[in-house]
Amino acid sequence: DHHQSTDEPSESSKPCCDQCTCTKSIPPQCRCTDVRLNSCHSACSSCVCTFSIPAQCVCVDMKDFCYAPCKSSHDD
């Protein structure tokens, strides 16, 4: 069976952020400081990764909002 490609992002690549910091300016400037392995989330346009294996990647986009937290299904 062959996989049909769709534009729907997979659940794991949906933009989300657990550690988001914003400035107090109007509009706020928000940056996600989550570290992900090998890639950034699907909506990231500026992804910076280390050269280690696995690579540790951080999205350096500046937004005026924070994405929803990633850890929704694993509440302690």
From Swiss-Prot:
Domain of life according to the entry: Eukaryota
Recorded GO MF terms: serine-type endopeptidase inhibitor activity
The keyword Disulfide bond belongs to this UniProt entry's keyword annotation: yes
Disulfide bonds: 16-70, 17-32, 20-66, 22-30, 40-47, 44-59, 49-57
Pfam families cross-referenced by the UniProt entry: Bowman-Birk_leg
PTM text: HGGI-I, HGGI-II and HGGI-III are produced by proteolysis of the N- and C-termini of HGI-III.
UniProt keyword list: Disulfide bond, Protease inhibitor, Serine protease inhibitor
Residues the UniProt record annotates as site (Reactive bond for chymotrypsin): 51-52
Cited InterPro entries: Bowman-Birk_prot_inh, Prot_inh_BBI
Residues flagged as site, Reactive bond for trypsin: 24-25
Keyword Glycosyltransferase among record annotations: no
UniProt GO cellular component terms: extracellular region
PROSITE patterns hit by this protein: BOWMAN_BIRK (PS00281)
Family membership: Belongs to the Bowman-Birk serine protease inhibitor family.
Oligomer status and interactors: HGI-III exists in a state of equilibrium between monomer, homodimer and trimer, with homodimer being the predominant form. The homodimer is stabilized by the non-covalent interaction between Lys-24 of one subunit and Asp-76 of the other subunit. The homodimer is more thermostable than the monomer. HGGI-I, HGGI-II and HGGI-III exist as monomers.
Described function: Inhibitors of trypsin and chymotrypsin. HGGI-III has a higher activity than HGGI-I or HGGI-II.
Protein name (database record): Horsegram inhibitor 1
Species of origin: Vigna unguiculata subsp. cylindrica
